[in-house]
UniProtKB/Swiss-Prot annotation:
Transmembrane segments: none annotated. It comes from the Eukaryota. Gene3D superfamilies: Insulin-like. This is Insulin-like peptide 02.
Amino acid sequence: MFYLTFLLFGAICIGQIQLGQPVKFKVNEDGHRPSVYPIKYRVCGWEIFARYLAICHIRQRRRKRSIEADIITDKDTANSYFNRVKRGSGRFNIVEECCLEGCIPEEIREYCP
């Protein structure tokens, strides 16, 4: 209890939390104590992809493709780019982390190549 109170007081002092708004902290993936950092944002759809590109410092480049080049990929291959192995069993994906739960930049960075 003292630890959590200390974290909240510290976050208020450094200006990360605005008074009057509920504060949410990420719970570590093993289900134990909350992380030090409050949730920064909740993003969905194209916004996830834009943050991914910015945080991972990936630049989109236009390339000339041959007419025979297959620009369509199957759903499983496309989704595999945004998956990472979850500690324990199962998988997390970036949509679950950032859209449903809210995320911090460090979590998006885990998906960088």
